[in-house]
């Protein structure tokens, strides 16, 4: 997938419903995405931040609440690359 296509997938995911097959994506967080859970708990935000650390290669100290929908879209894409039992994402 080309870089611009990846951005389109992420941007498109912000407004659309999240359809994730939990049998394909084994991390339990993916089932929360599938149910369109509210990402208002500290635990969920920390998990999302951890994925962002992997994606960006550096630690972020704070997450802006206004950016959660973008993060959810990013997690949706990253779930497709999750490596079971490793807490790692293969990008």
Curated annotation (Swiss-Prot):
Keywords: DNA replication, Plasmid, Plasmid copy control
GO biological process, one term: DNA replication
The name this protein goes by in its record: Putative defective replication initiation protein
